[in-house]
C-alpha cells in the first residue's frame, strides 16, 4: 500500500516497530525492503513485547520463578490504558511517537492498520489534537470474532464504545472482505456509508518468477507456506490425514509434505508445540524447513507440485495467503471449514479441492483428490488457473483506494526533497554483549524438539562456540520422542572435533524427598534446585559465558546460574543465541 501511494505522488511516512522489536518475535526479512519506493520515509519505534524479552537478566524475579503467574499479571496490567491484551500498554508511547512525527512533518491523511487495535487510539488522538483526517484499514476486524464467528465483545462494552467513536470520526474504513464489512454495517449503522472493501491480494513481484514443474513419475511434493496458527487438534487431523492418504493411495507413495514459514514466536519459534507435533510425523515424509525470505518465495513454490492451504476460522477469515497460492497456478488443497471466506476467492479456481478439518479421514480424502489433480497437471490447466488468479493482483484494488484517499485529503503533498530512515523514536534497545566464541550452556526443563538442536547447534559450533546441554530428557531419546524419568539429570557436551559424550548423574541424595519436591516446588525452582545441588556442574557454571534457557521454565535456573557464575549472561531461546553469535561473527 505504501508503494502505491508513493508511486502516485504522495509523500509517505511509515511509522512501525524497530527491527529489534520484530527480531525477538518472528525475526526480520530485509529482502522485504527490496523494491520499496526510495521516497518512503521509515520511522522505527522502539517498543518491545515484554513477554518476549530474551535477556533473562532483565526479567523480574517473579517472571523467572513463576512464568505462568507473571504472564497472568502482565496481561492484566497491559489493559489498564487500552482494552487490548499485550498491546494496550503501548497506547501512550505510540500516540507520543506518531505525534512527534506529525509535528516534524504534518500530513494530509493518517492511515492506521489494526491489529493491534491500540492503533485506533492513535488515530483518535491525532484527529482530536491536529484535526487530521484518518482511515481505518482493518486487516482484522476488532468487534467481530473472525475465528469463531459472532461478536468478540458486547455492545456497550469499553471496546465497543471506543470503536464506535473511532468509526464515527473516521473519514473511511476499509475491510478485507464483504462478510466482515456487512458485520460492521449491522453493528455500526451510523457509520456504514464510510465502509468499503479493500481486499488483500498477491504481490506480482513475489511470484512472477515461479516456474511450476509437472510431475513425471517422481513422488509428489506438497507444501505449506505461511504463519502457522492452526489449533493443535486441527494440525493433528491434517497430519493424521496425510499419513492415512500416504499409506493407502498409490499416487502418494513416498510423497512428502513440507512446512515453511513461521511456526511459533519468540523463544518458541520453531520449537513450540506445533513444531513438536510436525516432528512426530517425520517418518511419513513430513518436515519443517523454517521461515522463507520474500526474495526466496518464488523458488520455494517452484519446488512443490501442490499447495496445502490450512486455515483457522470460517466465514470471516479470507487470509492473504490464498491470493499468493492462486498466483502460482499450482493445485491447491484447502483444509478449512466449508463456509470459509477463502472459498469466495477460490470458487472458480480450476485446480482446487476442499477438505474439512473435522477428521483425519476427511483430510485424507482431500489429499487423494488433489493428488489426482496434480498428476493431471499440464500447461493448459496452469493457464486456466492463472487466468482466475490474475484478477486478484493487489495493484488492481488500489486505484479505488487512491481515488478515495485523494478525495479525503483533497490533494497529496509534494514529494520531500530528501528522505531519512535514521529517526528513531523512544529509547533504542541495547543488545546484550557476548564474547567471541563463547562457552554456551543450554538448559531445558521440558522435552527438547529434535529440529531445534539439529538446526542451531551446528551453527554455534561453526562459529567456534563450545556448547553444553543440561536437560531432564536424554537428548538421544528426546530426538526419538522418548522421555527419561525425572530421577535422572542428563548432561551432554558438544565440542568441535569430538564425538558426543553423555554422563548420567544419579541424584540419590534427593530420592527420599523426590515426591515432596514434586508436590511443593514448581518446575522452574525444581530445575534450579537440582542443578544447584549437583556439585559436578560447578565447573560448567564457573566456565560458562552464556546460559540459554530452551524454554521459559528453565529461565529461573539460567538466571541463577548466571548469578553464580558472576560473569555469564542468561538469555531465552536457541534462536536468540544463534542470532547473537552469528551477528557477532559477522561483525568480527
Which residues does each PLM region occupy?
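Conserved donor-binding/catalytic core segment of Leloir-type glycosyltransferases
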Residues: 214-233, 239-242
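N-terminal subdomain of nucleotide-sugar transferases
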Residues: 1-50, 172, 189, 245, ...
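Nucleotide-activated donor-binding/catalytic signature segment of Leloir-type glycosyltransferases, i.e.
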Residues: 249, 254, 258-263, 268-296, ...
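Acidic donor-binding loop of glycosyltransferase active sites
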Residues: 171, 283, 287, 299-316, ...
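Carbohydrate-associated surface elements
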Residues: 179, 201
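A charged, aromatic-enriched C-terminal amphipathic alpha-helix characteristic of glycosyltransferases
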Residues: 358-364, 375-405
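Membrane-proximal helix-turn-helix segments that form the acceptor-binding/catalytic region
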Residues: 85, 99, 118-121, 125-129, ...
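A conserved catalytic-core segment of Leloir-type glycosyltransferases
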Residues: 16-92, 477-525
Amino acid at each position: 500500500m505504501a508503494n502505491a501511494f508513493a508511486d502516485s505522488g504522495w509523500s509517505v511516512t511509515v511509522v512501525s516497530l524497530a527491527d529489534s522489536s520484530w527480531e525477538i518475535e518472528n525475526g526480520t526479512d530485509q529482502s522485504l525492503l527490496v523494491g520499496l519506493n526510495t521516497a518512503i520515509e521509515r520511522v522505527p519505534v522502539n517498543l518491545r513485547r515484554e513477554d518476549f524479552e530474551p535477556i533473562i537478566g532483565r526479567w523480574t524475579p517473579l517472571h523467572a520463578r513463576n512464568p505462568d503467574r507473571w504472564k497472568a499479571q502482565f496481561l492484566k496490567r497491559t489493559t489498564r490504558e487500552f482494552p487490548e491484551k499485550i498491546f494496550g500498554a503501548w497506547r501512550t508511547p505510540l500516540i507520543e511517537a506518531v505525534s512527534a512525527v506529525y509535528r516534524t512533518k504534518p500530513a494530509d491523511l493518517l492511515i492506521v492498520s489494526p491489529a493491534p487495535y491500540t492503533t485506533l487510539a492513535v488515530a483518535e488522538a491525532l484527529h482530536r489534537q491536529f484535526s487530521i483526517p484518518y482511515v481505518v484499514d482493518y486487516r482484522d476486524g476488532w468487534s467481530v470474532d473472525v475465528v469463531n464467528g459472532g461478536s468478540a465483545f458486547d455492545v456497550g462494552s469499553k471496546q465497543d464504545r471506543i470503536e464506535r467513536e473511532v468509526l464515527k470520526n473516521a473519514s473511511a474504513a476499509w475491510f478485507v472482505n464483504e462478510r466482515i464489512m456487512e458485520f460492521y454495517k449491522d453493528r455500526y449503522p451510523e457509520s456504514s456509508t464510510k465502509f468499503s472493501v479493500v481486499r488483500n491480494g498477491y504481490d506480482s513481484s513475489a511470484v512472477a518468477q515461479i516456474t511450476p514443474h509437472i510431475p513425471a513419475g517422481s513422488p509428489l511434493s506438497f507444501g505449506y507456506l505461511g504463519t502457522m496458527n492452526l489449533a493443535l487438534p486441527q494440525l493433528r487431523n491434517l497430519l493424521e490425514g496425510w499419513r492415512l492418504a500416504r499409506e493407502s493411495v498409490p499416487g502418494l507413495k513416498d510423497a512428502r509434505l513440507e512446512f515453511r514459514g513461521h511456526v511459533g514466536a519468540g523463544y518458541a519459534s520453531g520449537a513450540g508445540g506445533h513444531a513438536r507435533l510436525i516432528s512426530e510425523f517425520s517418518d511419513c515424509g513430513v518436515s519443517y524447513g523454517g521461515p522463507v525470505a520474500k526474495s526466496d518465495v518464488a523458488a520455494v513454490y517452484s519446488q512443490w507440485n501442490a499447495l496445502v492451504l490450512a486455515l483457522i476460522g470460517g466465514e470471516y477469515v479470507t487470509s492473504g495467503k490464498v491470493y499468493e497460492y492462486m498466483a502460482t497456478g499450482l493445485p491447491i488443497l484447502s483444509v478449512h471449514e466449508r463456509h470459509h471466506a477463502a472459498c469466495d476467492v477460490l470458487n472458480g479456481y480450476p485446480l482446487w479441492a476442499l477438505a474439512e478439518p473435522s477428521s483425519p479421514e476427511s483430510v485424507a480424502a482431500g489429499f487423494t483428490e488433489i493428488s489426482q489433480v496434480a498428476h493431471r497437471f499440464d500447461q493448459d490447466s496452469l493457464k486456466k488457473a492463472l487466468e482466475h488468479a490474475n484478477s486478484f493482483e493487489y495493484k488492481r484494488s488500489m486505484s479505488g483506494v487512491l481515488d478515495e484517499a485523494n478525495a479525503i485529503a483533497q490533494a497529496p503533498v509534494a514529494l520531500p526533497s530528501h528522505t531519512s530512515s535514521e529517526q528513531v523514536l523512544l529509547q533504542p534497545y541495547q543488545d546484550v554483549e557476548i564474547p567471541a566464541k563463547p562457552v554456551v550452556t543450554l538448559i531445558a526443563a521440558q522435552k527438547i524438539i529434535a529440529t531445534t538442536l539439529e538446526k542451531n547447534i551446528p551453527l554455534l559450533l561453526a562459529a567456534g562456540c563450545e556448547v553444553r546441554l543440561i536437560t531432564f530428557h536424554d537428548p538421544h531419546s528426546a530426538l526419538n520422542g522418548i522421555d527419561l524419568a525425572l530421577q535422572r539429570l542428563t548432561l551432554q557436551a558438544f565440542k568441535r572435533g569430538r564425538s558426543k559424550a553423555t554422563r548420567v548423574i544419579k541424584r540419590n541424595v534427593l530420592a527420599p524427598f523426590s515426591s515432596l519436591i514434586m508436590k511443593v516446588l514448581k518446575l522452574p525452582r525444581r530445575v534450579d534446585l537440582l542443578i544447584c545441588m549437583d556439585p559436578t556442574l560447578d565447573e560448567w557454571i564457573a566456565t560458562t559465558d552464556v546460559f540459554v534457557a530452551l524454554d521459559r521454565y528453565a529461565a529461573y535456573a539460567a538466571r541463577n546460574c548466571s548469578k553464580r557464575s558472576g560473569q555469564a549472561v542468561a538469555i531465552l531461546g536457541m534462536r536468540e543465541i544463534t542470532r547473537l553469535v552469528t551477528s557477532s561473527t559477522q561483525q568480527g
